[in-house]
Amino acid sequence: MKPVIALIGRPNVGKSTLFNQITKSRDALVADFAGLTRDRKYGDATYQNKSFIVVDTGGIGESECGIDNYMAEQSKTAINEADIIIFVVDARAGLLASDEQIARELRTLGKKIYLVANKVDGVHAEAALVEFYKLGMGEPLQVAASHGRGVQQMLEDVLQDIPEDENPEEHDKDTGLRLAIIGRPNVGKSTLVNRLLGEDRVVAFDQPGTTRDSIYIPFEREGRKYTLIDTAGVRRKGKVDEMIEKFSIVKTLQAMKDAHVVVVVVDAREGIVEQDLHLIGYALEAGRAMVIAINKWDNMSEYDRKQCKLDVERRFDFIPWARIHLISALHGTGVGELYPSIHRAYESANLKVSPAKLTQILNDATDQHQPPTVQGRRIKMRYAHMGGQNPPTIVIHGNKVDKTPADYRRYLENVFRKVYKLEGTPVKIEFKTSENPFEGRKSQVDERTAARRRRYIQKFKKAEKKFKR
């Protein structure tokens, strides 16, 4: 089993930057804002054939109210999960009272702890680190995480007692069905994730946009593996002023591309707004399978529920293939019914059919409804084959098929959907016109032969006229 290493420290000491250096990614949002990382964030890492899991935590601050206190509780949870703790301090800021308080708590845990002094660049390291010996954790390991300096030496020290992997490929674990939960800020995404997981895993605070980063959470249900991706809420671009929110939008779009199925969460009480439609548009551009969850359905009047249903039917008419569920993430109503739709969408998105079967369906469709004519010549569709999955892509070859009008494309899409009962996924149809191998070639016959052909043609036409008389 992979060991778990937790990065612990007060806010803004550089834990997220160090996390990125260790995991070789930008998986944690990094900016010069105290308390930016608001939730535990897991990342797989490998160093010198040793695999481990890194947990990036929110800072343990001095505030005892609001979200800062809640984040402190999340950090304590990460400490309990960890096999090794990296206690990060700021060499530039020096030793603070909150560092000493954290050190006292860590010493009571009986776990292996490594003191790491970050931001040693630009300071006299030996002088700056003297005061940290007061913590009683030995000599601090020196790093400059923003530049990657000292990180390798730190990992060698931290991982010295961890055995090498017998086979690194065994650690490329199957993440199962990857499920991205997306939506505007404060529509209940994190509450839905917590309900699906059955634990208070993601910070769900009554503040818009409490989850700024995308969080990957592996779990199992009824013997099936999943990875839940809880994304930051996407705001309208006009309101995205802070660098943090810009990072979050990018992370949400990346999470969509990484997911197999996207669950779009909509607030029933606020109704469907343009940003909900834009978000669905992003998912369609990514070609992702989709399930719609209309959340906060509880405590609505019968009239409001009726109006909401009418609004859903009207505004979502461009995705008739998407399953729509009315749920209450807070109370769990309807949440369990999401899974069958998720599974059906996943299976539809990963359709695999032989070229022979697809071509037969194509022939039946064109026999029932002939393709239109283009410039006096009818479009001829010869054969079809799969071009990919998620979304299912069907490639059709023939003559002038690239001229196929939109309404006939929709007809073919509906035929394939009906035959294979495709639900919850867009279907992409591509057309490839067969090239004429002789196009552009000049005639190789000499003038004498060409003249003889012309005489034969003239004689044939005269004979044809006499026959008609």
UniProtKB/Swiss-Prot annotation:
Chain sites annotated for binding GTP 2: 183-190, 230-234, 295-298
Subunit structure: Associates with the 50S ribosomal subunit.
Single GO MF annotation: GTP binding
Source taxon at top rank: Bacteria
Single GO BP term: ribosome biogenesis
Biological source species: Acinetobacter baumannii (strain AB0057)
Protein name, as recorded: GTPase Der
InterPro entries the UniProt entry points to: G_ENGA (IPR031166), GTP-bd (IPR006073), GTPase_Der (IPR016484), KH_dom-like (IPR032859), KH_dom-like_a/b (IPR015946), P-loop_NTPase (IPR027417), Small_GTP-bd (IPR005225)
Ligand binding (GTP 1): 9-16, 56-60, 118-121
SUPFAM superfamilies associated with the record: P-loop containing nucleoside triphosphate hydrolases
Function recorded in the entry: GTPase that plays an essential role in the late steps of ribosome biogenesis.
Domain KH-like, residue spans: 351-435
Annotated EngA-type G domain residues: 3-166, 177-350
